[in-house]
Amino acid sequence: MPKLSFFQTPSTGGWGARTGAPATTTGTGAARVSGEQDMEVTPGPSDSVSAMAFSPTADMLAVASWDTYVRIYRIDKTNAQPVQPYQQYQHEGPVLDVCFNAEGNKVISGGADKVARCFDLNTNQPAVVAQHNEPIRCVRWLRAFGGALVTGSWDKTVKIWKIEPQPTLITSLDVPERVYAMDTIGLIIIVATAERKIVAFQCNEATGTAQQVAALDSPLKYQTRCIAALPEGDGFALGGTEGRVAVHYFHDPPDPKDGRMKKFAFRCHRRANADHPDVPRTETLLYPVNAIVFNSQGTFATGGGDGSISFWCKASRTRLKSTYFY
């Protein structure tokens, strides 16, 4: 059974903190996490965790798993006892993604059963709120249209839904390939698909539609693992299977002073021989970048398959800190 725990450290502000809290860092080196301050989850999911989402309004965490369940945990930082599921509900196949609505009173998940389900934390009842012809890979909450659900599927469509009072499809958008990753900010939806394609849509609340505003090939050479919208909504950060991140802008003319552009890419989540005893001296292990998250100040964190989380400053293009969990 996979082990799931909440790691507690002195607050670093913007990471998981309330909106507007300042982000701080403690150095540029790498630290290895001990288990002394973990809050263990018992029981944890019985299969791999596919996605997690924190509530925007409370100390709650939703966890989607390949064992077909979504588990919702209420975190009490004053209680040292193991954290147990507060609520849970089930899909008819592996659950691939999960999110909260803006008010934090609903958990929405999508999965291999081709539907999105909404669990109402006020009534403790799940309901189907969206459907596709193939598995739903991504779910995100959109603040446009008075609050709406966005679903991205392997059927090569992205759909926007009103889920109250009854589930209603607002619009369906075609994308070039199967949806692999997705994010939203303001009126913007950014989608990464198979075959290294990136598309962006801007919602029009007056007409109830969304128009494509960007279409490009990924700046990375290999398969996309994750994507995150920049806080200003003018671009995105993209993580790939080759241990590399690209920060890209929709409009990026050369600076008239030096000809430089704002976009950049960098290597991360890689281990050379000195870091890993199983790697030959002349080789480096490349790990996928599985998650990217920004705080409101523009610094961001990446989580990699090497078991580490790294913190980065977008403005100075530098790494602030890395933490290894195993």
Segments and roles (model prediction):
Residues 61-65, 107-111, 149-153, 189-193, ...:
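Conserved beta-strand element within WD40/beta-propeller blades
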Residues 42-49, 88-95, 130-137, 173-179, ...:
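WD40/WD-repeat beta-propeller blade N-cap
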Residues 81-107, 124-134:
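Blade-loop segments of beta-propeller domains
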Residues 75-78, 121-124, 163-166, 203-206, ...:
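Short loop/turn segments that connect beta-strands within beta-propeller blades
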